[in-house]
Amino acid sequence: FGAAAHLGAIVVPINWRLSAEEVAYVIEDVAPRVLIVADEFKALLPQHGLDGMQRYTLGTAPGAAQAPWQPVSALYLDRTVPPADLNDDEGLVIIHTAAVGGRPRGALLSHRNLIAASLQTQLAWRLTPADINLGVLPLFHVAAIGFLLATQQAGGATLLLTRFDPPSLVKHIDEDGGSLIGTFPPMLGALLDAAAAQGSALDSLRVVSGIDVPETIARLRTSCPQATFWSAYGQTETSGSISLAPFDERPGSAGRPTALNTVAVMDELDRPLPTGATGEIVVRGPMVFQGYWRCEADNAFTLRKGWHHTGDMGRIDAEGYLWYSGRSPAKELIKPGGENVYPAEVERAILEHPALAQAVVIGVPDVQWGEAVKALCVLKAGHTLSAEELIEFVGARIARYKKPKHVVFVQALPRTAAGLIDREAVKAAQGWT
């Protein structure tokens, strides 16, 4: 990564959880000149369309790679290469995010974007050369890249781990002095369980950032009183978190906007809203990305009038704290018979049923009403429930036109790299994007 920045190349980390078809799309989208792949993921690569690309493999001993592949060690040089002559707004990394149309869009982040993100992280968490970042998040995630760069620029180190293994992680914290970690559910809970089982107080851990439920954060507070859980809000498109604060400072909020960014809330006509009013969260500043790769129409809309329009809803209170409330209604709206139905409202009603563990609601074509509500649900272990029973249950709790017309029970729901239910992937799988 550092070598690419030095040379002026753009890095495109690919999510190894993608399907082979999705990987092929990403490769086609960016048309790379160089491909570096771990041996275990070669099976995800397309069979065609790689001609002309230099191909290097990780995990292969020198001399063992078969043409056209070479070991990544072939890229190593024993001489110094002068840095490329770049301006700060040239691209450094493309991270593909979910798209409304079901195809991932590549968010282009510049050198300036990532330097700004690194500086604000260093300042907020007071990073020093003594800090050690525990690299358990995958490096196709903007938070993982941000934590790595911030720690490095502060003079600290990152311990890159190939997978999240709680007992091993406890050992690394105790033996290596790990002080910083980014997590998503259920990682923190599993780490605390392992620490309790191993009799560890995780004494060196001081910064935990990510998403989790208040109960788990309370466990952290009790088990590791020296560690602070930080709440934050951000996107790939904002190079990471543009608001953050210790969770206990304002529980439930996403923290305060950082000094390098301006955050506002606007209505559907792009007019600023007063304090406390809910609208779309918009951002401007040096952390806002350069745009989606080869998506001019999307860029014109998303970056209109000098602001990045996040598609997320929220409000800013009188003390400047940002409160995230969900995706923009324009992004998530079902219209059976012209009526407005918001998925979150239906999902809340569904999850009141004691037999349900997870649920996601989408709109699907309907001959009579134009669009209908469809629910995909995961049952709790040992429970049974029919579609008819669930529809009747929900219909008793919200307006009848909002209840699902179709219910499908599934074993699991797809999730994003951030651990959230991937609604767009559900839509794509159902053939309705």
What residue ranges belong to the model's regions?
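Conserved pre-ATP/AMP-binding loop-to-beta segment of ANL
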Residues: 74-96, 103, 126-132
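A short helix-loop-beta submotif of the ANL/AMP-binding
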Residues: 1-12, 16-20, 29-34, 131-132, ...
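ANL superfamily adenylate-forming
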Residues: 42-88, 195
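Conserved AMP-binding/adenylation subdomain of ANL enzymes
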Residues: 115-132, 140-180, 194
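Gly/Ser/Thr-rich phosphate-binding loop
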Residues: 153, 175-183, 192-251, 262, ...
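AMP-binding/adenylate-forming catalytic core of the ANL superfamily
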Residues: 18-21, 35, 262, 269, ...
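ATP-dependent adenylate-forming carboxylate-activation enzymes
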Residues: 9-27, 39-42, 136, 156-175, ...
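Conserved AMP-binding A3 loop
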Residues: 92-116
